[in-house]
C-alpha cells in the first residue's frame, strides 16, 4: 500500500466513524470540513510506516489508531485558528472552521475531535493492554502534560523574550509530544523491547523539535500560497522563535542537525532487528528545507 492509499484509508476511517447517526448533522459537517481540508498526514503516516518497517502487516486497527491521532491534530488546528488563539482566517488554503461555521460550532468541532479518538481506539481489535497504553500515551501527548500544556506556555510567552531552553520546553510539549506519539504507538503495537521503545521515543522527540524549527523558518520565509495560511503570524504576535533567537541560517543548521540525529537513531534500531525504513526515511527527509 503506497502513501496515497494510506492517506485515503486514514480519511475514510474518520468518515466512517462519523457516518453513523449523529446527534447533530451540523456538528459532523463542521468536523469533516476540517478533516477533509487536506494536509500531508505526516503524523498518521509516520505511525503506519513504522508498523510496516517492523514487518507487521497493516490492519484496520492500525488505521484506527493513526486516524485517532490525526483527529486530535485536526481539532488542535481548529482551536489554534480561533480569534482567542492565533486568530487566522485561512488554513490549508481555505477558510478556517470558525470563519465557515462560526466560533461556537468550531469550538464544539474541536472538542469532538479531542474526545472521539479515544473511543475509536477503544473499539479497535487490539489486546486490551495495548489499547490502555495507547490511550494513556495519547492522553499524555495531547492534554495538560503535552500539547495543551505547551499551548498554554506559548500564550504566556507572547511578548516576552524567551531563552532557547524556555522555547524548547514550550515546543517539546506543544508540538513535540504529539509528533512523538507515532513512534511510541508503533512500539506498543509491534511490542518492541524497552531499549527499542526508548530509542523510538527519542526519535519522535527529535522529529517534534525539527517540525517546530521548520515551521518557524517557514513562517519567516514562505508565502501564503506555500503555507496555505497567513505568514509571519509569529512576528506580529511578538513570539520567540528559533530564527529570532538563533538567526535564520543557524535555525536551518539546527533543523538539519536534528534530522540527522533522528536518522542515525533509526539506523541503530535497524542494526539489531529486522527493520525496513526506506519510506519512513523519505518522510523524515521531506522535512528538510533547501534554498
Language-model segments: residues:
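All-alpha prenyltransferase/terpene-synthase fold signal
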Residues: 1-291
Amino acid at each position: 500500500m503506497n502513501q496515497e492509499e494510506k492517506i485515503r484509508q486514514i480519511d475514510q476511517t474518520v468518515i466512517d466513524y462519523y457516518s453513523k447517526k449523529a446527534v447533530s448533522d451540523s456538528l459532523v459537517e463542521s468536523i469533516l470540513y476540517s478533516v477533509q481540508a487536506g494536509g500531508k498526514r505526516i503524523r498518521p503516516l509516520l505511525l503506519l510506516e513504522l508498523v510496516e518497517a517492523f514487518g507487521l502487516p497493516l490492519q484496520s486497527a492500525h488505521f484506527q489508531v493513526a486516524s485517532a491521532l490525526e483527529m486530535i491534530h485536526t481539532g488542535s488546528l481548529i482551536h489554534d485558528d480561533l480569534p482567542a488563539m492565533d486568530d487566522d482566517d485561512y488554513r490549508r488554503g481555505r477558510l478556517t472552521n470558525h470563519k465557515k461555521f462560526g466560533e461556537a460550532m468550531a469550538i464544539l468541532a474541536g472538542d469532538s475531535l479531542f474526545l472521539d479518538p479515544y473511543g475509536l481506539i477503544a473499539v479497535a481489535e487490539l489486546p486490551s493492554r495495548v489499547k490502555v497504553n495507547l490511550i494513556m500515551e495519547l492522553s499524555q501527548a495531547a492534554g495538560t502534560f503535552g500539547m495543551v500544556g505547551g499551548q498554554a506556555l506559548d500564550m504566556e510567552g507572547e511578548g516576552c523574550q524567551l531563552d532557547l531552553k524556555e522555547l524548547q520546553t514550550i515546543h517539546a510539549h506543544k508540538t513535540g509530544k504529539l509528533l512523538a506519539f507515532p513512534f511510541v504507538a508503533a512500539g506498543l503495537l509491534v511490542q518492541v523491547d524497552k531499549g527499542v521503545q526508548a530509542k523510538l521515543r527519542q526519535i519522535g522527540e527529535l522529529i517534534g523539535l525539527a517540525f517546530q524549527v521548520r515551521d518557524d523558518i517557514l513562517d519567516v520565509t514562505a508565502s501564503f500560497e506555500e503555507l496555505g495560511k497567513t505568514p509571519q503570524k509569529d512576528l506580529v504576535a511578538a513570539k520567540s522563535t528559533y530564527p529570532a533567537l538563533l538567526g535564520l541560517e543557524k535555525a536551518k543548521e539546527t533543523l538539519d542537525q536534528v534530522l540527522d540525529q533522528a536518522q542515525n537513531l533509526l539506523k541503530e534500531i535497524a542494526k539489531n532487528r529486522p527493520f525496513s525504513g526506506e519510506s519512513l526515511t523519505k518522510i523524515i527527509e521531506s522535512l528538510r528545507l533547501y534554498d
